[in-house]
Swiss-Prot record:
Protein name: Fibronectin type III domain-containing protein 8
PROSITE patterns: FN3
Gene3D superfamilies: Immunoglobulins
Gene: FNDC8
One Pfam family this sequence matches: fn3
PANTHER family in alphabetical order: FIBRONECTIN TYPE III DOMAIN-CONTAINING PROTEIN 8 (PTHR32430:SF1)
Length: 324
């Protein structure tokens, strides 16, 4: 009897322990799970373009030289990665399927940015002195513009601020002009990707970032400007001079233009650069070894020719001897 009673007591303790373990497991399951480490997550380093108005085309945007960016739409955090550098967070269903990857900026780009910052620092004592004098004389005649300029980059959506050539009234001694127009000199295409590179003018006006405008173009003749087929897509705040466009349509012509921006505003768009993707023909070449084509061009050099008085007299004599 005693052994039987002990056996029953042991079974009861074992049942109590099992019940406590089961309750503990349920409590652990109900606790909120921690968010996974963002460093271990797979992130995309691509930029999605922002659609512009369907009424305009690339030629109209280049003539007007103004772009009104639409306001961002509220979406969930899961629709957009934290590394997405697009202008605003749009739903993936409304975005153009074309993606853009920005390569690491070259050393000359960083050198230009550093030179611009050093120029600002060198003129900072002079700016402070002039600012004290202006405050002693009276208030700023244009407070709205001064407040906007002290925040750094100007608002590109406001056309009134695009033509400003100085940051504040007190910094009038430091003249910052608009950046030069970029020149696209190379592109490499395949059936679905395109790598576009343009030049950066070292030693001239500093550049804060670039804007890229892409649009599918219709076929035109040699001397004709590329006609817009669909509405353009803009990629903003690009730090670098080389971009890679992905998920393009095979055997399709595209038109691309670039402009630079700095503290003075935005520069002019470069001439439309036309390129075409290759056709997808798996019978002519294997799928795992696609063909790529690279095209390079040189920027035309301007030469200045000076003619003296003697050369002018010789030309006049030749014109007299050999009239038209």
């Amino acid at each position: 009897m005693a052994s039987e009673a002990l056996h029953q007591v042991g079974d009861g303790e074992e049942a109590v322990l099992k019940k406590e373990n089961f309750n503990m497991m349920n409590a652990l399951d109900q606790l909120p799970k921690p968010f996974p480490n963002p460093k271990s997550m797979n992130r995309t380093v691509t930029t999605k373009g922002l659609p512009l108005s369907s009424k305009g085309n690339l030629v109209n945007f280049l003539e007007d030289d103004t772009i009104n960016l639409p306001k961002p739409m509220p979406v969930d955090d899961s629709d957009c990665s934290s590394d997405d550098t697009s202008i605003s967070a749009f739903s993936s269903t409304l975005l153009n399927p074309i993606k853009l990857a920005v390569t690491q900026p070259n050393s000359s780009f960083f050198a230009g940015m550093l030179e611009g910052e050093l120029n600002k620092l060198s003129f900072s004592p002079m700016a402070k002195n002039t600012e004290k004098e202006d405050l002693a004389l009276g208030p700023c005649p244009c407070p709205s513009k001064c407040q906007m300029a002290t925040r750094g980059l100007l608002d590109l959506d406001n056309p009134e601020l695009e033509t400003e050539t100085s940051s504040t009234h007190s910094e009038s001694s430091v003249v910052v002009d608009l950046p030069d127009t970029p020149f696209i000199f190379e592109h490499t295409v395949s059936n679905s990707t395109a790598v576009i590179s343009w030049t950066y003018a070292l030693g001239k006006q500093p550049v804060s970032f670039y804007q890229v405008l892409l649009q599918e173009a219709a076929e035109t003749q040699e001397n004709e400007l590329p006609k817009a087929k669909n509405r353009p897509w803009i990629f903003n705040k690009i730090l670098g001079t080389t971009v890679k466009l992905m998920e393009l349509k095979p055997n399709t012509c595209y038109c691309l233009t670039v402009r630079a921006a700095n503290t003075a505003g935005v520069g002019k768009w470069c001439k439309p650069y036309k390129f075409a993707t290759l056709a997808t023909d798996f019978s002519s070449f294997p799928e795992n070894n696609p063909i790529q084509i690279t095209v390079r061009r040189k920027e035309p050099q301007r030469k200045i020719v000076s003619i003296g008085l003697e050369e002018m007299r010789r030309l006049e004599d030749l014109e007299y001897l050999f009239p038209y």
